[in-house]
Amino acid sequence: MKIFVGNVDGADTTPEELAALFAPYGTVMSCAVMKQFAFVHMRENAGAVRAIEALHGHELRPGRALVVEMSRPRPLNTWKIFVGNVSAACTSQELRSLFERRGRVIECDVVKDYAFVHMEKEADAKAAIAQLNGKEVKGKRINVELSTKGQKKGPGLAIQSGDKTKKPGAGDTAFPGTGGFSATFDYQQAFGNSTGGFDGQARQPTPPFFGRDRSPLRRSPPRASYVAPLTAQPATYRAQPSVSLGAAYRAQPSASLGVGYRTQPMTAQAASYRAQPSVSLGAPYRGQLASPSSQSAAASSLGPYGGAQPSASALSSYGGQPAAASSLNSYGAQGSSLASYGNQPSSYGAQAASSYGVRAAASSYNTQGAANSLGSYGAQAASYGAQSAASSLAYGAQAASYNAQPSASYNAQSAPYAAQQAASYSSQPAAYVAQPATAAAYASQPAAYAAQATTPMAGSYGAQPVVQTQLNSYGAQASMGLSGSYGAQSAAAATGSYGAAAAYGAQPSATLAAPYRTQSSASLAASYAAQQHPQAAASYRGQPGNAYDGTGQPSAAYLSMSQGVVANANSTPPPYERTRLSPPRASYDDPYKKAVAMSKRYGSDRRLAELSDYRRLSESQLSFRRSPTKSSLDYRRLPDAHSDYARYSGSYNDYLRAAQMHSGYQRRM
């Protein structure tokens, strides 16, 4: 007969000791001791009954009363209940009696701090779970739930409760409030095949989230940060929403000019044109005080600008179109009227009726407040050529600056310029109607001029490299090169015109730093090729190189506009700051140089906090302050550095590192 002996301490109870205990009652065939119970096989049925009667409750060890009963094969379908967080003071008998009040208990096994109770009926098991879950037993709240492991099937307990190698998958029963660990934890399997080998509390499964993110060393930095640091553009671009770049820059929150310029070579101008419906060259020049969308298509003054110029939107003209396209035509090759922008004498002075000169340029240009005229005039040679920085700020007060212009017509216009203030345009539609040449072009649009809002286009014209925009035209243009405008114009004049508060309206310090910094200062072809749609790049590349250089425009003019950053005038600066992590600029043919260069880049005392790329990866440098690179374990070993001492002395000097290390450095073993 098979006798179950419960509450046995398997650690200090041997099968021989147990067999000797049962021997007086009959022949003991075998004895198997598990961790907390044992099975004794006796030959005679009567001897087994006598042993059960005599030894049930017997204390084999002080304080451990044996549970001796006939081993019963478990019914084929029992309901297995997992009981977690069982107090060490709670015996299987006590637990069994607790559950037996709710129904018949087939089996109750306590393993360390959890137990399994097998009940005969499902209803009883569910009632027991409902009533006992969270109940305090011997000072600990037990966690009771239906075991998710399939019910044990088999004739006896001994075979099923063996294998000590099966450890619980997880489950910290010290936290009963977790509502059970049934889904992830296999206490059942743990106990089902094992009541042995549990030397510690079962561990709860690793949660699906991870407290620590991927190492920042492996995380790719966001691409945008490499385009151009946000600081490349003046804070005014980022901070001021009213800059009339408006839609263009406000729409791209990172607003790094690098991004803006890379996609739209003509920069914000394209965007601002894209945003305005009438989107004609006229619109920006005609009323730069107007917000781009306030001019209707009817108000488009393409006629006044070139008469012959197609109504192609400035978007295309500024965007990526070839040099011959509409705007470039209008600026570069177009006859007298739009040569106006390159050959300013003709355009401003003796300009055709359809142009600005005779049309009382006062009215047409003065419409633009100082802010908006900025962009358009800043690019036009004659108008700014002799002008001082102060003169570029307000056209209303600039009789003198216009007198100095080469065109005779400006001397005549000094009175209208002096007389009219930028503000006066909103109130003088008559000025437009009365102009001689405005009949076709402007006379029909007084409302458009009068009603235009005061948001200047200045942002779009000033902020974008105005040069870029009209450069084409200037490169291909006739006699009057840029020299008047950009070359002769003092640095102060240029900066004033671009960055003075009046010029930009709301942006006091918005020098062209960012726009110009993103393109190289001297070579037009290089700067355009680097940041333009291919076809436009081709057209720019094809145009005379003297666009910037030959016209006598010194790089100083640009450098003074806080473009000192661009040291190398002939190469486009890299879109992100080079660091010691950047690949070498050129391959080193000399192996000594290569080894030394690599050892410098991967030297073991370089802290990540000193490498600006990693600084950019993290909000705070503190996370990297204590994590030096471990070059001794680094997989990027130096190349073949063993041929002579001079070659590897630079890279192997971490053996002598202690003399060089600063005190804050922690050697990581």
Swiss-Prot record:
The modification N6-acetyllysine is found at residue 164. It comes from the Eukaryota. Keywords: Acetylation, Cytoplasm, Immunity, Innate immunity, Isopeptide bond, Nucleus, Phosphoprotein, Repeat, RNA-binding, Transcription, Transcription regulation, Ubl conjugation. The modification Phosphothreonine is found at residues 206, 572. It is found in: Nucleus; Nucleus, Nucleolus; Cytoplasm. GO terms for cellular component: cytoplasm; nucleolus; nucleus. One of its GO terms (biological process) is centriole assembly. Residues 1-73, 79-149 form the RRM domain. The keyword Nucleus applies. Residues 307-354 are annotated as: TRBP-interacting domain. The modification Phosphoserine is found at residues 161, 220, 242, 244, 256, 272, 280, 520, 523, 527, 562, 582, 618, 620, 623, 627, 643, 649. There is a cross-link at residues 126, 135, 138, 149, 153, 164, 600 (Glycyl lysine isopeptide (Lys-Gly) (interchain with G-Cter in SUMO2)). Residues 148-175, 193-232, 284-303, 569-590 are annotated as: Disordered. GO terms for molecular function: mRNA binding. Interacts with NCOA6, CITED1 and XRCC5/KU86. Interacts with SS18. Interacts with STIL and interferes with its interaction with CPAP. Interacts with gamma-tubulin. Part of the HDP-RNP complex composed of at least HEXIM1, PRKDC, XRCC5, XRCC6, paraspeckle proteins (SFPQ, NONO, PSPC1, RBM14, and MATR3) and NEAT1 RNA. May function as a nuclear receptor coactivator, enhancing transcription through other coactivators such as NCOA6 and CITED1. Regulates centriole biogenesis by suppressing the formation of aberrant centriolar protein complexes in the cytoplasm and thus preserving mitotic spindle integrity. Prevents the formation of the STIL-CPAP complex (which can induce the formation of aberrant centriolar protein complexes) by interfering with the interaction of STIL with CPAP. This is RNA-binding protein 14.
